[in-house]
Amino acid sequence: MNIHQLNVQYDERQDRLLVRVKTVQEQEVRLWLTRRIGVKLVEPLMTAVARIEALDPAVTLADEASRKILIDLKQEDFLQKADLQTPYSNTTTALPLGELPMLVTEVTIHLHANGLTQLVIKDGGDEGQQARNCTLNLQSFMVHGLLHLLQQAVHRSQWLDPIESPDQEESAEQAEQARRTQKKIYTH
């Protein structure tokens, strides 16, 4: 499967991430990522990016702090070169996994010595549906791209925003009110 485009969008109604993978042959794989899978996938992808970049001798020889800086610079370089402006093409000739997105229940990441990253994506199925899976072979720039799109979508979903209880909101309002009404004391 030669991947041409990736798209990750937050669907507020479903409260899921819709991942669409388009091939050069105009085939499209559609995947639903739940909050649990979407958030948990970010760290392994970051690790995969770090391992891919560690294949570069300049990165390998660096100390830990320098290695992190070099990896961050490579991510920035990717973002500068990536085509993030071209809209995702909605023309599709085939949907190998069907029209409905596959609900992802497990993702396994394998990094190969040549820098190719393999994602084995599974849907355990349930009573009404048969288990499905697909394998995506991503070149390093696609891993960078998927990580970037996933991070953006998770941010838009607000899944990682802290949840404030009414008590916390009330306490914050009371503290602000007390600060505003507090008498100013001047000393000489």
Where are the predicted features?
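Intrinsic, low-complexity N-terminal interaction/targeting segments
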Residues: 1-17, 74-126, 182-186
